[in-house]
């Protein structure tokens, strides 16, 4: 269920303590997380989009950041919008931008295509297909799962775990 997958991701990111056991990541692991609820990053925040992204970028100059945001489908004056007025899809694109700038080699995405239009969903698909690291993905988007997954770990209602190498369609 969705509550459990979100809890698992929060445990993996160290935002929530597990009831039992522990999580240990390798020393060279750099993680980035796209939470299903991204409101804490935006609610009440009056920063302009370009300045919001600047805080997550090693490169701080406007030309680089505006070019980056352009590739994320933000045009011209959109980069000066306050982040608290962005649409749900725009906020997801902001969070994906933040992830790309993080240098992560492991990304955790909790329902990444929620609130996105078709063009943005296709861009997410392409980006994940090209990502050289590890992707942990929770999604109801069959197309996204089919195009990006080469291993499925499914938690069953009875507590068993299915771990299958292959595509999502192979799992089904």
Residue ranges of predicted features:
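ABC ATP-binding cassette signature C-motif
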Residues: 1-172
